[in-house]
Amino acid sequence: MEAARTERPAGRPGAPLVRTGLLLLSTWVLAGAEITWDATGGPGRPAAPASRPPALSPLSPRAVASQWPEELASARRAAVLGRRAGPELLPQQGGGRGGEMQVEAGGTSPAGERRGRGIPAPAKLGGARRSRRAQPPITQERGDAWATAPADGSRGSRPLAKGSREEVKAPRAGGSAAEDLRLPSTSFALTGDSAHNQAMVHWSGHNSSVILILTKLYDFNLGSVTESSLWRSTDYGTTYEKLNDKVGLKTVLSYLYVNPTNKRKIMLLSDPEMESSILISSDEGATYQKYRLTFYIQSLLFHPKQEDWVLAYSLDQKLYSSMDFGRRWQLMHERITPNRFYWSVAGLDKEADLVHMEVRTTDGYAHYLTCRIQECAETTRSGPFARSIDISSLVVQDEYIFIQVTTSGRASYYVSYRREAFAQIKLPKYSLPKDMHIISTDENQVFAAVQEWNQNDTYNLYISDTRGIYFTLAMENIKSSRGLMGNIIIELYEVAGIKGIFLANKKVDDQVKTYITYNKGRDWRLLQAPDVDLRGSPVHCLLPFCSLHLHLQLSENPYSSGRISSKETAPGLVVATGNIGPELSYTDIGVFISSDGGNTWRQIFDEEYNVWFLDWGGALVAMKHTPLPVRHLWVSFDEGHSWDKYGFTSVPLFVDGALVEAGMETHIMTVFGHFSLRSEWQLVKVDYKSIFSRHCTKEDYQTWHLLNQGEPCVMGERKIFKKRKPGAQCALGRDHSGSVVSEPCVCANWDFECDYGYERHGESQCVPAFWYNPASPSKDCSLGQSYLNSTGYRRIVSNNCTDGLREKYTAKAQMCPGKAPRGLHVVTTDGRLVAEQGHNATFIILMEEGDLQRTNIQLDFGDGIAVSYANFSPIEDGIKHVYKSAGIFQVTAYAENNLGSDTAVLFLHVVCPVEHVHLRVPFVAIRNKEVNISAVVWPSQLGTLTYFWWFGNSTKPLITLDSSISFTFLAEGTDTITVQVAAGNALIQDTKEIAVHEYFQSQLLSFSPNLDYHNPDIPEWRKDIGNVIKRALVKVTSVPEDQILIAVFPGLPTSAELFILPPKNLTERRKGNEGDLEQIVETLFNALNQNLVQFELKPGVQVIVYVTQLTLAPLVDSSAGHSSSAMLMLLSVVFVGLAVFLIYKFKRKIPWINIYAQVQHDKEQEMIGSVSQSENAPKITLSDFTEPEELLDKELDTRVIGGIATIANSESTKEIPNCTSV
């Protein structure tokens, strides 16, 4: 889950300003933008060493170098982000910034931790927002030499403290030609700091004329800051004063922080290589107090409401708190995961001083804890989630808290809505996420980008219900890329000012195309290209073969406009860089603008420009995106239809960025740059108030209606906005509001999306997915209560439509049916089968179906102690028990209500480091005939292992030192086999079921090739597909369901075996029953041969089931001579196995063949019979291979050649230690 875009967080010093002539590489951040360049002017190196605070979370790059044309890519490589590799990149809590800023996804999922990938923190899409995460500073490095240098760009001698100014006269009203228009400006040089290669800038802009700039010299060889200067302006940047004497001439400063709730309060950190101290100012940097610290600060997190409350994270992973703005500090907790601590959220957490934090444990896991900053003792801490969680997975964002738990290699995500109990996030059953990022948590809804098991460079977009639990698909295959910091960029953009409008770049047949939605992802369409180009020539571009495509990455540099921008105070106005054609391109790009929320577009430039909003969207200012020095900018008052050219400096300036937002109220913008390669930093103050003739009046506005391809209802309402009339050069002012009137519409189909478990067929029909049973109520539905039975539709969150189809599509209340307990499970909190003697072992009891409130629970710990509960409520957080002796304990959970009961067993042991075990059993066995059962263990080189085998209801295991065992089942029915493998101090188990019958017949099945593309190759999917095939066979042939068993094999191509079983009410007339069975086989065989058996996997995917064998398979039973053909086939299997064995042994003596065998072993099935296997029949066992983990990854099962019987996966319940990486 990853941040898509967020406002400048609190507690972060600013990100870097890069001193370079290549504006493509400039990266600035408000509230202390840090500038870094190599002292030689060459390509920089990472600016933060291991001892420094880690870098600020990466802001989304405007483009990745490898995606640009070669000449641009090489230019972009001239500067790099100079940050130390951090463990996690997250949005922060609070403000701490100058002016407003919007940035895109920050943060890579951490790699290298033990327990699965963590959840990158979420942030808000579109519009300015407050984020609540801690984040350290960032550094960036100066690029290579600039392309050219002005002739008069040489440096002169200037006083160290005063700098220099250059005055530029304002033009007369209604000046002459556009090229003669000038804007009043002043230029100031930070004289004496030309050697400094980093800088941080802060200007709040809110009723303040103060600008602070911290410059410093970072020595890459020493890994520390060796010099620093602090500059302060009180006249909006006209002049600056050097403050080194006020902070201490020998004090070397490293970072600047601004309080987000009171921007007059400033914090400066000294470089820890020199000393550990903090300087505090309460008068906007005029005076400072210095305090020594006993720890080294890595990052700060200010409280979003209380201006004096601060959290400090140290380099040794300790969390400190201060309630007096850093004058005194108190240790809260140790072993805190970096960037995983959060302040309370007003209106949700009861205490304002509550802190949410993730604490690492000594065994490689983490716990989610909360405590108050002044009362964080062990007795006062709370654990809202009882189980261990993955490291770097805690996210607290708005109304939601997210965590991740990885068990048996598969991650599960949990969410708490408004601090309620955690619930597991429900994605469509077979989404199987490899990676997940939170895009947005706006408007009581979660947007999540999920990379599924069959995706590599794309993500699917899912949107949730209000509680953030049930997710449905909004768009497939959204393009992703890696940022300069390695962060994931999801190319999705929310248009500010109008809810529900998103732009997304989707990968379609290896082409990337831009789509737009007006109803939060329910419907998407391509962008219509402009009718004419910039020169007025017709553009011949017909949908869907040709359309407009946009670059949706936001700027990594808040001092550049980014490649797409919109503004809350200018609804409907979108400016973006893109191209016209069949797909998105990084060549032949221009700048396009839409005045009506993306319905229509016009081209305004034929090359790349930075375009900013002036006067809260009332005007636009543009500056060419070029590595060359510039003197002019362009201003438009009619939404880009026409532009006026203004000069802002008499000497051409290599522009590194411009600060526009902070000076919005005063109509002042600051342009940062330099006149030559070795010159000082130049800060050009541009006063553009003269371009406005007056304040706007009522007569200066006009209205416009928001439409979606002519449809006036967008997100269930009609909206009318007002905007300034084109050409009116009047100032809007801060209080300008764009919205005029809004009224609800009658609900139509496009106001509803498919509910969880349903998929879209056609334009508006939602039907259940093949894996979903809509008739099954939630497991927390108690008898006597009611639940909402979905109609398959749910109204889009924040949609305001009324009446119409609303009643038809609204979920209907139904009484909860009584249900017997089913799917009972007992697990340990960490998912492992190990407990230390004398320590707490915590058990969790789970139940798939049943009445939680009316079911009695009993848990027998297996050591003579048992506990009972009247319902599930007291045990939701787990049942703790201390074992006083070591050994094997059979822990039994029993659930019962008046409709039935269920039992679950867990075998607990103190065991060794075995990581995986795979139990291989046949699906079907013959009564009174031996069955060969084996276990495959990984890693294979573990020495002596002990195997514990449980058959059926036995309470004592059979213990062997061999990985295989033979067993005879004496009665018909379904039996359970459990194996536990112990070695050293670890124990793992696998459980499977086997059907025992007097006789059966089977047929091999194959499928149409389109099923392979949708095959994730996991047991649950194979089981569901088997059920779908069974239902299809029953429907076509009317054969009783209990006489059919389908076993879908692992691997590709997808294949299966059909077992035809005798009826349950088997009589003594066996001959007749065998005849009936053969008749059923012939009926099924004919139906399959006629292609009558098929099913729809998903909309548009129809799968046909075929018979692999051309002839009917013989009957398999307990009679030795019943079928000579069966015996011949079995003998064939034996001889083939012997031949393969000999060839394999011979191949082992030839090195290159041996290598081939090792690589290919995951495709070679073991050939063993499920019934009466010969004792002396040679076979190839999986343990012969050197890399059995490949087999376990695919969970390879074995089958008998010729279709006699099959070794395959049955439903498996595994208790395997959680051994994944985060």
From Swiss-Prot:
Residues 135-1125 are lumenal. Highly expressed in brain. Keywords: Cell membrane, Cleavage on pair of basic residues, Glycoprotein, Membrane, Repeat, Signal, Synapse, Transmembrane, Transmembrane helix. Glycans are attached at residues 207, 456, 789, 800, 840, 932, 953, 1065. It is a single-pass type I membrane protein. Residues 1147-1222 are cytoplasmic. It holds the Pfam family Sortilin_C. GO terms for biological process: learning; memory; neuropeptide signaling pathway; postsynaptic modulation of chemical synaptic transmission; regulation of long-term synaptic depression. BNR repeats lie at residues 231-242, 279-290, 320-331, 515-526, 592-603, 634-645. One of its GO terms (molecular function) is neuropeptide receptor activity. Residues 827-917 form the PKD domain. The chain crosses the membrane at residues 1126-1146. Homodimer. Interacts with NGF. Interacts with DLG4/PSD95 and PICK1. Plays an important role in modulating synaptic transmission and plasticity in the hippocampus, probably by affecting the trafficking and localization ofAMPA-type glutamate receptors in the postsynaptic density. This is VPS10 domain-containing receptor SorCS3. The gene is SORCS3.
